[in-house]
């Protein structure tokens, strides 16, 4: 089996999409290929068909490889709960919460598990494309590294180093990274990749030659800056601003926002613009307000209260439209109780009281794949998604369920999810990916269009669009990189 590892000079240099591109290229060339990231840190996660939790970046990479996402592609997921603590997910299940120092001391225990997981991949795939995290030059973490050079050494993988030229300083970041690696680590790096380039490559070439003279490693290509409709799991996600889009969707950007990949399908609608809101002045009067998921719902509710957004949201709810997802759904209720101090030691807190329901946080985390039908609809309106939450919400007297769940992790069930007020303008659900399917997204956006005097439109199938964008990404990267050299590095062709 062949393997290659993509590392970067920093976070957000484009490692994840380079891995996705290589997965699609190798698949197109007839090889069975699998992505692998030993440890990911993200608040954007996904639930597999067997009810296990993994990072979203490896989900996209799995699709690029033509595979169903599985947790062996991302054995360890860290989900920050505060600046100093994270929830640790190991092989899809909650391992526990820990501080940075506690996890640093834990990492050595996971090495054997990671090696065993990777061995299984070696037995089942022609090529494994690995992804590092952050930078391999974090010299203070070297002795217990399990995600960059430590992982590459564990499975004897060659490394390609990616630098982001769009931020500036790419030559210094590549040379500086190499300077901080030890001799054994330097020998693993077989090439560099310049990512997100704008302009004339001819002007860049003298710099590439000088860089090669300094670090003695060839540049395998320059990938142009390209806007693609593919999800971005990094926390500082920025939505492309459209010059004009008649449908204005505002999203509350809370400090612990999670699973904002729920919005990606909405971004694909040509006449929809999405903007983040962090203050009451920014809210204005959107056509739709979305309160997204949160890794710390109580802290984010306190944030809404302290910054004045709570009152603005309540005022907007008089004639505006609001959808809450997961933590955002919990926020819309009358009360949140935390008897086990899952999030804080407050015990309980009043919600926005826009939906007549209460949430109680439990010790056990719910991680399920679900299929649901929108209630009170004549036409077939099926939603497929997943749930990731600690709380259980209970209805009051003056509330209507939004969905009926009929399938949970492949088993037939029959229970309600979500809620909608009598007026029909405030609703919430626990289902992540609720907009990914055509039916519900088309229904909501068409209702917004009609309200503004616009014509209804058919929504495109998000999965089809994603496949086209992955092919486009692969074409760009194939044209930009020396694929013959890369095949030589991994010992193929």
Swiss-Prot record:
Q: Ranges for the GATase cobBQ-type domain?
A: 246-440
| PROSITE patterns registered for this protein in UniProt | GATASE_COBBQ (PS51274)
Keyword terms of this UniProt record: Cobalamin biosynthesis, Glutamine amidotransferase
Q: Does the keyword Cytoplasm apply?
A: no
Q: Identify the metabolic or biological route this protein is part of.
A: Cofactor biosynthesis; adenosylcobalamin biosynthesis
Q: Which GO terms describe its molecular function?
A: ABC-type vitamin B12 transporter activity; catalytic activity
Q: Does the keyword Transmembrane apply?
A: no
Q: Name one GO biological process term.
A: cobalamin biosynthetic process
- Superkingdom of this entry's organism? Bacteria
Q: Where is the active site?
A: 326 (nucleophile), 432
Which NCBIfam families has this protein been placed in? Answer: cobQ, PRK00784.1
* Family designation: Belongs to the CobB/CobQ family. CobQ subfamily.
- The protein here is known as Cobyric acid synthase
State the organism of origin. Answer: Clostridium botulinum (strain Loch Maree / Type A3)
Encoding gene (name): cobQ
């Amino acid at each position: 089996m062949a393997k290659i590892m993509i590392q970067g000079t920093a976070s957000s240099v484009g490692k994840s999409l380079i891995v996705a591109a290589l997965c699609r290229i190798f698949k197109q060339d007839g090889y069975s290929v699998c992505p692998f990231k030993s440890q990911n840190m993200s608040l954007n996660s996904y639930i597999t068909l067997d009810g296990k939790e993994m990072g979203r970046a490896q989900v996209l990479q799995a699709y690029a490889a033509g595979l169903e996402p599985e947790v062996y592609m991302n054995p360890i997921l860290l989900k920050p709960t505060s600046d100093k603590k994270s929830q640790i997910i190991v092989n899809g299940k909650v391992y526990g919460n820990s501080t940075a120092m506690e996890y640093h001391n834990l990492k050595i225990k996971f090495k054997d598990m990671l090696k065993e997981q990777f061995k299984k991949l070696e037995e089942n795939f022609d090529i494994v494309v690995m992804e590092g995290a952050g930078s391999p030059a974090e010299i203070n973490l070297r002795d217990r590294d399990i995600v960059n050079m430590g992982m590459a050494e564990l499975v004897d993988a060659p490394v390609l180093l990616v630098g982001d030229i769009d931020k500036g300083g790419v030559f210094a970041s590549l040379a500086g990274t190499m300077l901080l690696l030890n001799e054994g680590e330097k020998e693993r790096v077989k090439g560099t990749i310049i990512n997100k380039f704008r302009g004339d490559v001819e002007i860049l070439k003298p710099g590439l030659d000088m860089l090669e003279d300094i670090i003695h490693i060839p540049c395998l290509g320059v990938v142009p800056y390209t806007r693609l409709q593919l999800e971005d799991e990094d926390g500082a996600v920025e939505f492309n601003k459209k010059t004009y889009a008649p449908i204005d969707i505002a999203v509350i950007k809370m400090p612990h926002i999670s699973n904002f990949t729920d919005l990606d399908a909405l971004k694909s609608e040509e006449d929809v613009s999405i903007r983040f809101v962090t203050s009451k002045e920014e809210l204005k009067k959107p056509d739709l307000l979305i309160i997204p998921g949160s890794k710390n719902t109580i802290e984010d509710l306190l944030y809404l209260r302290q910054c004045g957004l709570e009152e603005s949201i309540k005022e907007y709810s008089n004639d505006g439209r609001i959808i809450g997802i997961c933590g955002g759904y919990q926020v819309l209720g009358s009360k949140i109780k935390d008897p086990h101090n899952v999030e804080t030691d407050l015990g309980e807190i009043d919600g926005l009281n826009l939906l007549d329901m209460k949430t109680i946080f439990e010790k056990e985390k719910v991680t399920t794949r679900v299929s649901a039908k929108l209630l009170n609809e004549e036409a077939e309106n099926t939603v497929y998604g997943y749930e990731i939450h600690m709380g259980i919400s209970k209805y009051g007297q003056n509330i209507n369920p939004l969905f009926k769940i009929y399938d949970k992790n492949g088993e037939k069930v029959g229970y309600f999810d979500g809620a909608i007020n009598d007026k029909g303008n405030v609703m919430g659900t626990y289902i992540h990916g609720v907009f990914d399917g055509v039916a519900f997204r088309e229904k909501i956006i068409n209702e917004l269009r009609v309200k503004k005097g616009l014509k209804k439109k058919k929504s495109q199938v998000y999965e089809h669009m994603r496949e086209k964008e992955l092919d486009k990404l692969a074409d760009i990267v194939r044209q930009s990189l020396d694929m013959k050299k890369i095949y030589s590095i991994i010992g193929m062709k």
